[in-house]
Amino acid sequence: MKLGMVGLPNVGKSTLFNALTNAGAESANYPFCTIEKNIGIVSVPDERLDKLAQMYDPDKFTPATLEFVDIAGLVKGASKGEGLGNKFLADIREVDAIVHVVRCFEDDNIVHVDGNINPLRDIETINLELIFSDIEMIDRRIDRAKKAAKGDKKFLSEIDFLEKLKTHLEAGKSARGYDFTEDERELIKSTPLLSAKPVIYAANLSESDFAGNIENNENFCKVRQLADEENSAVLPICAQTEAEIAEMDDEDKAMFLAELGLEVSGLNRIIKEGYSLLGLISFLTAGKPEVRAWTIKKGTKAPQAAGKIHTDFEKGFIRAEVIAFNDLMDCGSMAAAKEKGLVRLEGKEYVMNDGDIVLFRFNV
């Protein structure tokens, strides 16, 4: 699963990406320093894995991962190919969700592409480019449906829906805010709309604002209100602080976060929020050879989860031995959990839960 990091030039996007992935993307005080998209794989923080590692002392420790893509800075006119517009839109098309870095800090030494700080305008700039691109796609879809309707009247209802969606988009509203019926959702699946992708707004604050009372930052409050209105997530972060934290060892990091009154870094909150935003959960496998988290979509059944480990596991699935993470921790060992009857046998229709510890039985 991929999350694309977007933002106008000089909002702190690449600084945040560098901290997130330690990938070292060039970060400079001028537009388009990120011309080629940079890709980084990050581990999903999961304290359950750490506790399983203490229990099993495994030879190998493998957390779940997410892919983050630092996408080139965008300016107005992207949907018409201006700046790096065509590349920006093509890169957005490839990701599953968007982390939109929004500048909420004042700094005369860092230029803003529009000359002053206005996060709502910045958000609108990017959202409108995605919306304009979607309108073009909808127009082409309407043209095809109208031609098809000459021979098959069933396309008339599709045209009616597409016209309504186009009107919604032309009002400057993203597809995320459109109230799709189940049938409409099926219809639009073949036309991946950019403005329908889920969003996390990362509100980039100054170090002083981030360390103080965030509520005093009017820019952050405006972004939060907008996020609430469109059912998106918003996280206050300080890219500069995150860059410093990323260079610290675990002990110094814990002390620094405690001084800020935080339990986890902003980066970890972005990663966890991204995991949740994509509708992902983890099931766990544990033993001496390896303790590992496996990523699946919510609602995945046991055989399909087994297939994440190996296709043979899914083809020859017999049953799954399952215990909830908390039950195992309460018992202290798998042997004690089995004695108490807490290890369940589940069949092909079992829907996996987040934190299930599983041993799959199969035969091929």
Predicted regions and their residues:
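Conserved G1/Walker A P-loop phosphate-binding module
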Residues: 1-111, 139-140, 144
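C-terminal-of-GTPase-core extension/linker across diverse P-loop GTPases
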Residues: 2-6, 17, 144-351, 358, ...
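Phosphate-binding glycine-rich loops and adjacent basic patches that engage nucleotide phosphates
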Residues: 12-17, 45-57, 85-109, 121-130, ...
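Amphipathic alpha-helical transducer elements in NTP-driven molecular machines
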Residues: 32, 46-49, 62-68, 82-96, ...
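Conserved Switch II/interswitch segment of TRAFAC-class P-loop GTPases
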Residues: 40-45, 72-82, 93-155, 168-181, ...
